[in-house]
Amino acid sequence: MNFVYGYGNLQGYLPLREQLSRQLADINILAHPNAMLTTSGVSSAIETIARAMCQSGDYVLVDDPTWFWIIGCLQQLGLNVIGVNRNSHGVDIAQLQQILESYRPKLYITNSVLHNPTSFNLPPNNIFEVLRLMAEYDCYIVEDDVYRYFIEDN
């Protein structure tokens, strides 16, 4: 009866987190269910991550073009938003490196699969370059991977 009248687990429904842990393990991402937090959607997830990882005045990267909501959300938190050019060939690596050197952003919010709004997937060689630069400049990637299961081989 407590379940009906009480609040649920703040981290989210445990069986869901356990299932997510198994699915992530299938793609070699080890994440214990107790280290996970589920949200009601990507909007609240991005806002929660930005609040936890950034302070007002920090720089955050987004794809250019990007989903319009992200920019407004980040700016409301006092964050400086910088767009990184992206097209069917992937992220502009030279521009990304220049931005990382100049601004030292905390986060890069992106979709590598079925990017919104372009629907392009990042090519593997481009993904590896992005990952290399993120590691080199200590910038975290926030991957909005909502469309992953809409393409074959996933």
Q: What are these regions, as identified by a protein language model?
A:
Residues 3-138, 148-153:
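Conserved core of the PLP fold type I
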Residues 144:
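Glycine-centered flexible beta-alpha turn that most often forms the glycine-rich phosphate-binding loop
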